[in-house]
Amino acid sequence: MAKVEIEQQQTDGLREKMIGVNRVTKVVKGGRIMSFAALSVVGDGDGGVGMGKGKAREVPVAVQKAMDEARRSMIKVSLNNGTLYHAVTGVHGAAKVFIQPASEGTGIIAGGAMRAIFEVMGVTNVLAKCIGSTNPYNVVRATLNGLKSMNTPAEIAAKRGKSVEEIRG
């Protein structure tokens, strides 16, 4: 996969990052048909993040399709002063990611596709490790699955019928 780092600020206030562009080939009776597949993430810098894939005969069209799909598929993740509330694990296929909060000044310690997600969603301090498959598509999905599973202390307290102070100890 070609590593393409394109970051754009759109007028709607969303941060966009291209994770990669692949050239794919379909072999038919008359020869080969070349097209391009793009993977991108979009975030609002405040915990919102979405992932999109686009496929077209030309790179700019594939990139635009990926960005549009990412905008439509955004999810909201609660952040705790630029980091996460607790450690989470996400799995998609053979890709497994481990994500944990980090103290102020640590920065984003994560590889490739995960780093792009954290940058666009506004996370400034996080530790992340990818175990198993490092296929960008699966790593992005595993990361989003892990982030979806994260709960705030208020949500946990509400489920248990306790106060937030009791949960935090």
UniProtKB/Swiss-Prot annotation:
InterPro entries: Ribosomal_Su5_D2-typ_SF, Ribosomal_uS5, Ribosomal_uS5_bac-type, Ribosomal_uS5_C, Ribosomal_uS5_N, Ribosomal_uS5_N_CS, Ribsml_uS5_D2-typ_fold_subgr. GO terms for molecular function: rRNA binding; structural constituent of ribosome. It comes from the Bacteria. Pfam families: Ribosomal_S5 (PF00333), Ribosomal_S5_C (PF03719). Keywords: Ribonucleoprotein, Ribosomal protein, RNA-binding, rRNA-binding. GO terms for cellular component: small ribosomal subunit. One of its GO terms (biological process) is translation. Residues 14-77 form the S5 DRBM domain. Belongs to the universal ribosomal protein uS5 family. With S4 and S12 plays an important role in translational accuracy. The N-terminal domain interacts with the head of the 30S subunit; the C-terminal domain interacts with the body and contacts protein S4. The interaction surface between S4 and S5 is involved in control of translational fidelity. HAMAP family: Ribosomal_uS5_B. Part of the 30S ribosomal subunit. Contacts proteins S4 and S8. This is Small ribosomal subunit protein uS5.
